[in-house]
Amino acid sequence: MISVNDFRTGLTISVDNALWQVMDFQHVKPGKGAAFVRSKLRNLRTGSVQEKTFRAGEKVEKAHIENRRMQYLYASGESHVFMDNETYEQIELGENQIERELKFLKENMGVSIMTYQDEVLGVELPNTVELTVSETEPGIKGDTASNVTKPAKLETGLVVQVPIFINEGEMLIINTGEGKYVSRA
C-alpha cells in the first residue's frame, strides 16, 4: 500500500480492480475543508484517461509492473511475435494490443514489454527509432530558405511531415512519443 501523498508521475497503482498509471497529480489544500490529491490516471488495459480525486493520506495498492527486454521478430497474420532476450521465450500479441506501436516497429527491434502477474499490458518503445523513407515527393533544389514540409511515407506505413530536402531511401530519426520527424540518421 502507498499513500496518495507519495504519488509521482509514472507510478502504477491498482484501484477498483483496474491498473492505472499516474500521468499527473496535484496536492490541493483548500482554505476550508480537508486537503486532497487531484490526479490524472491512464488505464493500462484500455488506455482510457480518467481524473480521480483522493483524500489526503488515503492508501492505494501499488501495482508492481515488470518490464522485460524483448525483440520484435515478425508479423504473422493478425499477431506479432516477440522474443525474450534472456530466456528466448516467444510471445504473440494481437494487433489490437499494440495498434499504436505498430507504426514504429521494425523486425529485430529491441522493445520493453510491460507485464503484470504474467498479463501483457503493452509495448514500450524506445524514445526514437530509425526508419527509411519509402515514398515522398522529390525535393526542389534551392527551396531551403523557408520551413516548408511535405508528407513522407516510411517503411512501416507511418506518414510524417518532413523538410522538403528529404528524399526516398533516406534514414530518418522519428520521435515515437509524438510520431514526428527529428533529424536524418
From Swiss-Prot:
It is found in: Cytoplasm. GO terms for molecular function: translation elongation factor activity. It holds the Pfam family EFP. PROSITE patterns: EFP. It comes from the Bacteria. GO terms for biological process: peptide biosynthetic process. Keywords: Cytoplasm, Elongation factor, Protein biosynthesis. Its main location: cytoplasm. Pathway: Protein biosynthesis; polypeptide chain elongation. One of its GO terms (cellular component) is cytoplasm. PANTHER family: ELONGATION FACTOR P, ELONGATION FACTOR P (EF-P) FAMILY PROTEIN. HAMAP family: EF_P. Belongs to the elongation factor P family. Involved in peptide bond synthesis. Stimulates efficient translation and peptide-bond synthesis on native or reconstituted 70S ribosomes in vitro. Probably functions indirectly by altering the affinity of the ribosome for aminoacyl-tRNA, thus increasing their reactivity as acceptors for peptidyl transferase. This is Elongation factor P. It comes from Bacillus mycoides (strain KBAB4).
